[in-house]
């Protein structure tokens, strides 16, 4: 079978310029998803092209991804990233992945032992918010999570990411091996502390001495990641196959823009990521806050309200002047004033985001971005609203964004079509939707403490703002409600 590993590829395809036989699995990565392929794996590949070295990646997937992993092995762990710009496309074959393991194809025992190999210096993760098994209300490990319950009963055969990390670190300690750095690359606020809380929470339940050793020896740097990477579709894979002249089932498309800000605290070394344009810093939080509120907040705004209005893609929203103006106004008038970052031209940043959202080549579906809203609302919108409530400033578009999520999860768009709602809290949400009518819906959903906390449902201004926005959507539909908010 001909694959990208054996085919003669067109000259415009960038290929690894380093000796892949020198790679070792110095990075073990949880979650061989689209974003990781187009972001951390690509940037590590750039480092290898620039300065060489042995910083290979071992990809890990636990309970899914066995087909993808089999396909990756068949093409010598190579895969393609197609950077799609308004002015043309650039195909890049990534060679940084050295090996892969899957619980179904291999075994859980083999995966845990991989973490214990002496050369492993970094364990990185893109497992989404759900994978950390954190209780959103406390920010701590959720001891009632089914996988955490299992892992505490079966510590040497764990099934969760926190359980596997703790068992691997316990074995390394017992064998006299050095610790590794745990690097969350998920798009969640304060991701370093999230994974640290998960790991230490699990370790403390197993052994206070182990928890102390991890706290003293393991680092959990924060990161800010940014690149728009739509999920692969049959159409995007066919487009890449046409560019390459051969199928690549592991390929992914993305925008040309890429950014990675990393707290430079590694206990066992790291690749020279700065040679690939990565910003190594002492403090990631201001960058993360800027991105989550200005980029991700406006992305979710466009996803929920754009979908309700019938826009299938973010670029379709950008073709609609009402949504285009609203996204920029949301960024600059309501999100930017809540930030703590200094030395950044936020107007220029907003303009760059509008350009990126407008990229017609990406076909980033509003339905995809609208998923998992219960996990996204707090950091993308609610934290900014809390700042406005404290200051007494206005937040009409943020209110519309929150109410837009409420209408979206209610399950019907403005044309009366059913919505396929995907969310980890979908059962709780649908129960509250079913038990409330239009007039009660806002209060019913505000009762979800995992999302809104204890403060916001008791804040008179907040509740009034969301009720008013809900009424605008109910009366006028999403597009007209957004247009009215622009002129309010």
Predicted regions span which residues?
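Substrate/ligand-engaging "lid" and interaction regions
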Residues: 1-488
């Amino acid at each position: 079978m001909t694959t990208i590993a054996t085919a003669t590829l067109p000259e415009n395809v960038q290929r690894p310029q380093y000796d892949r036989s020198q790679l070792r699995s110095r990075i073990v990565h949880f979650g061989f998803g689209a974003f990781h392929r187009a972001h951390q794996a690509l940037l590590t590949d750039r480092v290898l092209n620039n300065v060489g070295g042995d910083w290979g990646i071992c990809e890990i997937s636990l309970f899914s991804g066995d087909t993808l992993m089999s396909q990756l092995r068949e093409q010598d762990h190579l895969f393609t990233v197609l950077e799609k710009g308004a002015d043309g496309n650039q195909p890049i074959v990534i060679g940084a992945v050295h090996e892969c393991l899957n619980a179904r194809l291999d075994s859980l025992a083999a995966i845990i032992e991989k973490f214990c190999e002496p050369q492993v210096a970094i364990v990185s993760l893109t497992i989404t918010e759900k994978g950390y098994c954190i209780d959103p209300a406390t920010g701590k490990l959720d001891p009632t999570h089914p996988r955490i319950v299992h892992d505490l009963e079966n510590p040497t055969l764990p099934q969760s990411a926190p359980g596997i990390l703790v068992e691997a670190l316990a074995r390394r300690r017992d064998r006299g091996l050095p610790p590794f750095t745990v690097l969350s690359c998920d798009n969640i606020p304060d991701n370093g502390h999230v994974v640290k809380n998960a790991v230490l929470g699990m370790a403390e339940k197993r052994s206070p001495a182990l928890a102390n050793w991890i706290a003293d020896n393991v680092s959990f740097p924060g990161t800010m990641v940014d690149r728009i990477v739509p999920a692969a579709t049959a159409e995007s894979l066919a487009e890449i196959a046409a560019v390459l002249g051969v199928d690549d089932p592991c390929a992914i498309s993305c925008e040309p823009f890429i950014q990675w800000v990393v707290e430079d605290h590694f206990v066992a070394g790291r690749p020279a990521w700065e040679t690939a344009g990565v910003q190594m810093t002492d403090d990631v939080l201001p960058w993360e806050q800027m991105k989550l509120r200005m980029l991700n907040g406006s992305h979710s705004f466009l996803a929920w309200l754009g979908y309700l209005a019938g826009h299938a893609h973010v670029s379709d929203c950008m073709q609609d002047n009402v949504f285009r103006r609203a996204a920029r106004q949301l960024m600059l008038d309501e999100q930017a004033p809540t930030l703590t970052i200094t030395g950044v031209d936020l107007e220029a940043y907003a303009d760059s985001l509008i350009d990126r959202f407008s990229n017609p080549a990406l076909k980033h579906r509003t339905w995809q971005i609208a998923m998992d809203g219960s996990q996204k609302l707090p950091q993308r919108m609610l934290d900014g609203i809390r700042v406005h409530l404290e200051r007494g400033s206005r937040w009409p578009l943020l209110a519309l964004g929150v109410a837009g999520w409420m209408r979206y999860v209610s399950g019907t768009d403005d044309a009366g079509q059913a919505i396929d709602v995907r969310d980890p809290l979908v059962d709780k949400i649908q129960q509250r939707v079913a038990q409330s009518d239009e007039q009660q819906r806002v209060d019913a959903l505000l009762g979800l403490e995992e999302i809104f906390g204890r403060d916001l449902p008791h804040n008179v201004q907040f509740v009034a703002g969301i009720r008013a926005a809900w009424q605008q959507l109910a009366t006028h539909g999403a597009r007209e409600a957004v247009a009215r908010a622009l002129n309010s």
